[in-house]
Each structure stands twice: as C-alpha cells, then as structure tokens.
C-alpha cells in the first residue's frame, strides 16, 4: 500500500478464511486479524449463500435490491444459521437476507477487529470478497460513512497480498551447498 496508495490510513482486508484491519499511523503499522474462527470472511459468505440457495455472486446481485436489513450474527456460521433460518421461515426476501448477511460481515469486522478504535481517513478495501462483491464493499462504505475521496479500491485489490510479497522479494543469491551446511 505504501507504493500504490500511500495516503491509506486504514486497510480492511477480507480473505477466504481471515479478516484484517491494518492501521497506518505516523510510520507505525498495527495489524489486527481474526483468530481461529472464519466468521465474517469469504467462507462465511459462501456458507450463508448456500442457505438461500445461491453463491456469493448471487448474494451480491440480490443485495442490490434490498429493502430491509435484519440483525444476523456473523461471529460464527452456526449462530448465523440460527438467525437466518427463522427469517427464511417468516418469508424474508433473498434480497433482504443477502444485504443482511453482508451487513453482518461489516459489523463483525468492525466490532471484532477495530474494537472501538476509529476507522477514519483514507480507507483501502482489499481481498477477494471486497473486490468481487460490490454490495459488501458498499455496506462497509455506508457503515463507515465514507465519501468517494476517502475510499481506496486499488486495481487488483484481490491480489494485494501477492503483489506485496512480490514487491518485498529480495533477489536470490547464489549459494553453494557447502556454505549452507556451514551456516547450519
């Protein structure tokens, strides 16, 4: 990010099985990452999509036409299912359920990782779910009350971890087997 979007104050990155909030303050980097559970990540979104008989991109399309947001727990897929099933039984639309699932991811990420620390300034959105699911990103932008000037969506944001690794790669040096053995 320091190369592609140096104005970034906070990065939110969602992956298939992890979520991160990274604060950039005065040259310091503070990274907060979810623990052992994949609640609020791409795999959570896939699990919830299957409950309403679609996939992640289907959720995204449905969420474009939502009318209401229902509270859904995103901390754990099991708890979320117990919130969603009664809503399905009561006739909640797939549009409303889809937007509610995305809002649950937003709420889990913000409450579980920011833990009260403000997310403000220029915010970058990274990772596959935020790259491919426009309505998930829109839910973050709405919740954080960001304007276009403070929203950073780099090209290839779903590949940013790989791009960062490539930029940090140091040229390989030639080493003999005997020198490696000596180092051990």
Language-model segments: which ranges?
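Conserved phosphate-binding catalytic cores of ATP/NTP-utilizing and phosphoryl-transfer enzymes
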Residues: 1-12, 20-30, 110, 114-115, ...
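Glycine-rich phosphate-binding loop plus the immediately following alpha-helix
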Residues: 4, 26-68, 167-171
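Active-site nucleophile and cofactor-binding loops and adjacent substrate-binding regions
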Residues: 12-16, 32-40, 100-102, 130, ...
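Glycine-rich phosphate-binding/hydrolytic loop that grips phosphoryl groups
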Residues: 45-47, 153-184
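Internal, active-site/partner-interface "lid" segment
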Residues: 55-86, 178-183
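Adenine-nucleotide phosphate-binding core of ATP-dependent small-molecule kinases
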Residues: 80-111
């Amino acid at each position: 990010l320091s190369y592609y979007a140096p104005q970034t104050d906070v990065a939110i990155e969602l992956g298939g099985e992890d979520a991160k909030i990274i604060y950039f303050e005065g040259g310091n980097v503070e990274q907060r990452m979810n623990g052992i559970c994949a609640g609020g990540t791409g795999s959570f979104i896939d699990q919830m999509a299957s409950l309403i008989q679609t996939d992640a991109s289907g959720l995204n399309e449905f969420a474009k036409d939502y009318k209401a947001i229902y509270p859904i727990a995103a901390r754990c897929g099991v708890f979320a299912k117990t919130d969603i099933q009664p809503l399905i039984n009561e006739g909640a639309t797939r549009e409303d359920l889809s937007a509610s699932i995305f809002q649950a991811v937003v709420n889990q990420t913000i409450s579980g990782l920011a833990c009260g620390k403000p997310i403000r300034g220029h915010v970058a959105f990274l990772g596959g779910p935020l790259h491919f699911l426009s309505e998930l990103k829109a839910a973050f932008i709405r919740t954080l009350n960001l304007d276009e000037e403070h929203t950073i969506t780099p090209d290839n944001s779903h590949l940013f971890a790989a791009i960062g690794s490539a930029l940090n790669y140091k040229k390989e040096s030639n080493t003999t087997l005997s020198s490696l053995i000596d180092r051990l």
